[in-house]
Amino acid sequence: PDQREEMYRAIRKFRSTKAIFTLDFQNDAEFVHGCIAGGRRYLHINANGDVDPCVFIHYSNANIYENTLLEALKSPIFMAYHDGQPFNENMLRPCPMLENPKLLREMVNKTGAKGTNAEAEETVEHLCSKCDHYAEEWGPVADRIWAEQKHKKAPYENYTEEKREHPELAAFEHADGSDGLRDEDLQ
C-alpha cells in the first residue's frame, strides 16, 4: 500500500510538472470510471481461444472457436462483470480481483466459469486468497486518498440502469433495451 500511494502521488506530480500525460494502470480508474475488463471496454482471448474477462483473471464460460464474440460477451461471467460494475465506488479500488477479491469469488462461483490458465491453473479461491491481505491493507489507504480529492462525474456510464449516477444516459439505449449490437456485426 505504501508503494502504491507513493506511485499515485508521483504520477500526479509528473502530470502537473511535465508536458506529458503518464498513465498509471492501477491508480487511474477514475479516468475510465472503474474496471475496464469483462467486456466493458476490454477483454482477453488466450492462445487456446478462451475468452477471459481480463488478462489477469483466467476464468471463462466461452471459447472464440465455439462462440461468436457477442455470445462470449453475453456469457455468464461477462454478464456478472456487467451487472457488478462498478465493483467499488472508490476508483482507487476498481479491480474485482486485487481490491475486491470477495466479488471475484462470487462471480466465478455463481457463473460456473472454468479456469483457463493452461500453464498454472488455480481455483478462484487460491487466486483470491493471494489478494485478500492486500485488499484489506489497501482499502483504508485508498479510502483516505479518495476522500482527499475532488472527482468529476463520468460523462458516460455503461453500467446497469440501477448503478448509473446519470439515469438520463439510459436514453442512449435502444427502445427495445438492447445495445444495438447484432451477432452478424461481430463475426
PLM feature spans:
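Radical SAM enzyme [4Fe-4S]-AdoMet core and its adjacent flexible, acidic
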Residues: 1-38, 47-48, 52, 56-67
